[in-house]
């Protein structure tokens, strides 16, 4: 590896990235470590995070406001894709990685840095997401990954940081790893590594427990235009405000917790806890609206596309050609996804209780009704069934002869 003089480090203020600063300087001999702090709506005072980077030895620390871009270019496409990895996880953390990587590369170009770095460990998913995105956007840049090479446990990393005056934000006894952005929270490690261990209530922050959620249900109406959520109730909101409002409503009523065994990119299974109340609520509403506005064959094929889209994003291929091709298909389906969905929030549940589309509904009450207003031609069903089952009938006749 060519000697690096200046590196741009993706920095969160957590254990691994904080320890990376002295490690890069002392173990790699890099003279300038510039940190990039991504504002993804996590709610932290990022000036404190920036100052922590400087106190930890960073030459310079830059904060990038990515919230609007994160919602409009990453979260909203995921909603249109009904993206749920493993049929549960709405990619709240995974969606942030290519955006951070893109800005990391841009800052490295701006500062004429030789390399970029991140604090991802050797058995996590984020290392794959960062590396693949950086390879796609800055193939000439070196990627330095201290946490993948230092072979320290989390406890040892905390001790290493303390030698250089870096305070640990977690307890050594139960060192949870928590990642937060506007879309949600991911929690792992510590006691949660036992898949039978129930999470303590203090693990959660965005969602109420069922016991503490309101006793009275709350009905919420979400309006979509071209597959994008544009209003909650009668209030038309910006994309960021939509996520914030959905988080508040769903979280208050205890909806949006996920406890799952997840198949990581590197081939191992891990126990993951997520909170993503708003994103899960919006995906649920969007998928319901599609049920009334899209043809059955489009829905069937879109289900296949959605699964693959979610896998590609989870696996780090945001900038890959297949993901871009699937984007084109999804975009082509969304012009008719206009209307509103009513959902009842109550004690951890989000139950669809209504849906409508004024101009794009494929539901015809006069065809679906069993009342006197029914215009469906029942007599034609006999001919349809005869043709529909013809191949099965021929097969059955042939096999019945063979069995005699």
UniProtKB/Swiss-Prot annotation:
Reactions listed under catalytic activity: L-citrulline + L-aspartate + ATP = 2-(N(omega)-L-arginino)succinate + AMP + diphosphate + H(+)
Single GO MF annotation: argininosuccinate synthase activity
Sequence positions that bind L-citrulline: 89, 125, 129, 177, 186, 262, 274
Record's subcellular location: Cytoplasm
Signal peptide: none
Keywords: Amino-acid biosynthesis, Arginine biosynthesis, ATP-binding, Cytoplasm, Ligase, Nucleotide-binding
One of the protein's GO biological processes: argininosuccinate metabolic process
PROSITE patterns associated with the record: ARGININOSUCCIN_SYN_1, ARGININOSUCCIN_SYN_2
Keyword Kinase: no
Keyword hit for tRNA processing: no
Superkingdom to which the source organism belongs: Bacteria
Main location (coarse class): cytoplasm
One Pfam family here: Arginosuc_synth
Protein's pathway: Amino-acid biosynthesis; L-arginine biosynthesis; L-arginine from L-ornithine and carbamoyl phosphate: step 2/3
Binding site for ATP: 10-18, 38, 119
Subunit structure: Homotetramer.
Protein name: Argininosuccinate synthase
